[in-house]
């Protein structure tokens, strides 16, 4: 796994298409200098914003999993961030996953899925369950099912039908 001290972090673009050194908030969260709430605010603002992601987002996935596991933190944000990043990385306006990062990124997604399975007996709200199912679907390459799951609580049956017929 790429070290949080690796100088490449500062060169990776975040969700706003500008360099964002994700190692700084990851390190701060790991050391307890950022609360859960502060950390996830940074993640949702700088690593995933309105379906935009960057290489920093991809590189952060395995690190976030490692930190959450160390802190015994399993919640909506972890699975939703991972599912969201994997889902939108296929969009044309987001950067390709660099070949040098692919194995580490995929291992991070697998680890999040395994971590979720270990927490199956925990109490989950509907949003966490939906996000976990979306993560499994998109990880397995079923973008249509992921999109369908995303429409489930919208109450828009036509959006759900469109989601599965457009893939």
Please give the residue ranges for each predicted region:
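Alpha-helical solenoid scaffolds in large eukaryotic transport, assembly, and signaling factors
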Residues: 3-69, 75-104
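Long, helix-rich interaction regions
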Residues: 87-167
């Amino acid at each position: 796994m790429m070290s949080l001290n690796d100088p490449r972090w500062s060169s990776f673009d975040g969700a706003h298409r500008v360099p964002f050194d994700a190692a700084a908030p990851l390190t701060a969260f790991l050391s307890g200098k950022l609360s859960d709430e502060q950390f996830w605010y940074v993640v949702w603002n700088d690593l995933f914003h309105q379906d935009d992601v960057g290489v920093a987002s991809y590189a952060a996935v395995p690190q976030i999993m490692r930190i959450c596991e160390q802190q015994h933190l399993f919640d909506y944000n972890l699975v939703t961030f991972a599912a969201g990043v994997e889902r939108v990385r296929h969009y044309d306006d987001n950067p390709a996953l660099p070949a040098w990062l692919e194995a580490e990124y995929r291992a991070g997604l697998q680890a999040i899925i395994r971590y979720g399975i270990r927490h199956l007996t925990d109490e989950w709200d509907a949003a966490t369950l939906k996000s976990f199912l979306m993560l499994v679907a998109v990880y397995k390459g079923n973008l249509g099912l992921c999109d369908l799951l995303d429409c489930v609580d919208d109450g828009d049956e036509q959006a759900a039908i469109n989601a599965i017929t457009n893939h």
